[in-house]
């Protein structure tokens, strides 16, 4: 239950309604927020995460040993160096 409360759609609801249990007692019931609110939260979270993930994927890709990928890696690195050099000179 504790781990379930850490999920963004439960934390971002902002309200708690109640439900009746079998014994007739009122207990708090967490409701999921609407999809627009959830998407906004996901986009905000993704924006914070995207850049580090891209760097990790890039590093993982560069570490692959497949001959075709080694060729592509070399080609991409050469183009990157040329691009970087061009950026510095302009």
UniProtKB/Swiss-Prot annotation:
GO terms for biological process: symbiont-mediated perturbation of host apoptosis; symbiont-mediated suppression of host cytoplasmic pattern recognition receptor signaling pathway via inhibition of MAVS activity. Residues 1-29 are annotated as: Disordered. It is found in: Host mitochondrion inner membrane; Host nucleus; Host cytoplasm, Host cytosol. Keywords: Apoptosis, Host cytoplasm, Host membrane, Host mitochondrion, Host mitochondrion inner membrane, Host nucleus, Host-virus interaction, Inhibition of host innate immune response by virus, Inhibition of host MAVS by virus, Inhibition of host RLR pathway by virus, Membrane, Modulation of host cell apoptosis by virus, Viral immunoevasion. Residues 65-87 are annotated as: Mitochondrial targeting sequence. Pfam families: PB1-F2. The keyword Ribonucleoprotein does not apply. GO terms for cellular component: host cell cytosol; host cell mitochondrial inner membrane; host cell nucleus; membrane. It comes from the Viruses. Is not encoded in all strains, and seems to be dispensable for replication. This is Protein PB1-F2.
């Amino acid at each position: 239950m504790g781990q379930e409360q850490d999920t963004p759609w439960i934390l971002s609801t902002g309200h708690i309604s109640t439900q009746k249990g079998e014994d007739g007692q009122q207990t708090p019931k967490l409701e999921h927020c609407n999809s627009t609110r959830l998407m906004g939260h996901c986009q905000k979270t993704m924006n914070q995460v995207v850049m580090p993930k891209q760097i990790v994927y890039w590093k993982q890709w560069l570490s692959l040993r497949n001959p075709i990928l080694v060729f592509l890696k070399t080609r991409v690195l050469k183009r990157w160096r040329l691009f970087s050099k061009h950026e510095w000179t302009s």
